[in-house]
Amino acid sequence: MQTIALAVIGGTGVYTLSQLDDVQVYEVETLYGRPSGPIRVGMLFGQRVAFFARHGEEHALPPHKINYRANIAALQQLGVSRVLALNTVGGINEAFGPRTLVCPDQLIDYTWGRVSTFCEEVGSEVLHVDFGHPYSPLLRGCLLRAARDVDVSLVEYGCYGVTQGPRLETIAEIARLRRDGCDLVGMTGMPEAALAREKGLEYACLGIVSNWAAGCGDGAEITMGEILSNVATVFRN
């Protein structure tokens, strides 16, 4: 197979990458089961790019039921070395309102019960990977430069608080995340980032702010319609 320059993982509201040309579809089996869906590989701006939807193409997988290990292992089996994760998130920091694009540099993991390592099988090597900087500086740099080159507004920092889901958070929970230093909240950033690090993949996140987190902004009730509408607006622009 020809080298794949980049894999893109789609989040809520991003179930296809319609710009891909000459698409080949791969149904990948891994030691950890099947990934969230077929992986589509095609040409984008002269580069081979892979894409799949983290929640499945019909959004059938809630955050805590996603087979994160199979997703990362499948990309590695296809020869992927760089992964751009699209994550639909809520804004906590007052500077990160709906339809803002953010390239976070830190995260805090509040999830529980998710299989978060490849180091569980008998005979597997136990890896204590350095996770001080959870996102690849190399890939983050590429993303930030690309945004500047095409004059796209992209916030260059932020701490992503990863919660369990699938429900949204309470106002008190968001207040806690704010005190902890979180700027954004979402449900799928972990264990995906840690698994990518264990496999030696360059991994970065592009956060798409779809709504204010509970108790932030105007304090209005958060609806799925608002989330999907704001994500669609970002991609139309």
Swiss-Prot record:
Keywords: Glycosyltransferase, Purine salvage, Transferase. The keyword Glycosyltransferase applies. The record marks 169, 224 as: Important for substrate specificity. It is an enzyme of class 2 (transferase). Pathway: Purine metabolism; purine nucleoside salvage. Substrate binds at residues 187, 211-213. Phosphate binds at residues 12, 54-55, 188. One of its GO terms (biological process) is L-methionine salvage from methylthioadenosine. One of its GO terms (molecular function) is S-methyl-5-thioadenosine phosphorylase activity. One of its GO terms (cellular component) is cytosol. It comes from the Bacteria. Its EC number is 2.4.2.44. Transmembrane segments: none annotated. The keyword RNA-binding does not apply. Pfam families: PNP_UDP_1. It catalyses: S-methyl-5'-thioinosine + phosphate = 5-(methylsulfanyl)-alpha-D-ribose 1-phosphate + hypoxanthine. InterPro entries: MTAP, Nucleoside_phosphorylase_d, Nucleoside_phosphorylase_sf, Purine_phosphorylase-2_CS. Belongs to the PNP/MTAP phosphorylase family. MTAP subfamily. Catalyzes the reversible phosphorylation of S-methyl-5'-thioinosine (MTI) to hypoxanthine and 5-methylthioribose-1-phosphate. Involved in the breakdown of S-methyl-5'-thioadenosine (MTA), a major by-product of polyamine biosynthesis. Catabolism of (MTA) occurs via deamination to MTI and phosphorolysis to hypoxanthine. Homotrimer. Although this enzyme belongs to the family of MTA phosphorylases based on sequence homology, it has been shown that conserved amino acid substitutions in the substrate binding pocket convert the substrate specificity of this enzyme from 6-aminopurines to 6-oxopurines. This is Probable S-methyl-5'-thioinosine phosphorylase.
